[in-house]
């Protein structure tokens, strides 16, 4: 049986990347929350 996670850099960035987060209002909320929490890495 094939494993469910077949990593692809392009897709990962498109869905979870910084520019993807910045492109929507809720994505910006996510980044703000991660900044507030003090995350070293904000996005993938």
Swiss-Prot record:
UniProt biased composition (Basic residues): 26-44
Gene3D superfamilies reported for this sequence: 1.10.287.3980
Any one GO BP annotation for this protein: translation
One term of GO molecular function: structural constituent of ribosome
Pfam (any one): Ribosomal_L34
Top-level taxon of origin: Bacteria
GO CC terms: ribonucleoprotein complex; ribosome
Region (Disordered): 24-44
Keywords of this entry: Ribonucleoprotein, Ribosomal protein
HAMAP family attached to this UniProt entry: Ribosomal_bL34
Similarity section: Belongs to the bacterial ribosomal protein bL34 family.
Protein name (Swiss-Prot/TrEMBL): Large ribosomal subunit protein bL34
Organism: Lysinibacillus sphaericus (strain C3-41)
């Amino acid at each position: 049986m094939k494993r469910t996670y077949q990593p692809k850099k392009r897709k990962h960035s498109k869905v979870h990347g910084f520019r993807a987060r910045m492109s929507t209002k809720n994505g910006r909320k996510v980044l703000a929350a991660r900044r507030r929490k003090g995350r070293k890495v904000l996005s993938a």
